Amino acid sequence: MGLGHITDVPGILVGHYQRRGKGWRTGTTVVRVDGGAMSSCDVRGGGPGTRETDLLDPTAMIDRVHAICLSGGSAYGLAAAHGVMRWHEEHHAGFPVGPQPSHVVPIVPAAVIFDLGRGGVFTNRPNDEFGFRACAAARSGAVTMGSVGAGTGAVAGGLQGGVGTASITLESGILVGALAV
C-alpha cells in the first residue's frame, strides 16, 4: 500500500521551492516525470493563467510532457516554467530537435494562482530560479503538503490554502494520482 500521494504512481517526482518573510510569501511546485508522460488538463475560471496547456490536447503533435509547473505570482509566475525547462535542458531531457543530446525542447505546461502581495511586497514573485530549484528538489516518496511550493501564498475565501495530493488504486488495478493547489 502506498502513501496516498501522487508519487505512489511510479516515475512521478514532486519538488517545491518557496520564499517566506522579508516581503515574500509565494512559491513553485514541480511535478516531474523522467522520460515524460502523457498528460491532460481542464482550464476553468474567469482569469486562468497558463502556458503550453494547448499541447495537452489529444490532437496535438506532442504526446509527452516532461514536467508540470504550478506557481504563485499570477501571470508573472509563469516565468518559473523557464527554470524548469533550463533544468531539463541541462539534463538533456526534452523533445529531441537536433542531432546532439542537448538539442531538446522540454515540454513544461504551467498554471499559476494569484498570490501577488501576500507577503507584503507586490513585486516579490516566482521567477525562473524558483522553477529550477523546485525541479532540482523533485523526489519520489512522501510529498510535503500545505503551505509549501505553489501553495505558500494560496488563500481562498480568506482561508489559508495550500498543496494537496492523493492517490487511489481502482478496482481495475489502475493507480491514479493527483496534486492540486
PLM region spans:
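Alpha/propeptide regions of enzymes that mature by internal proteolysis
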Residues: M1-V181
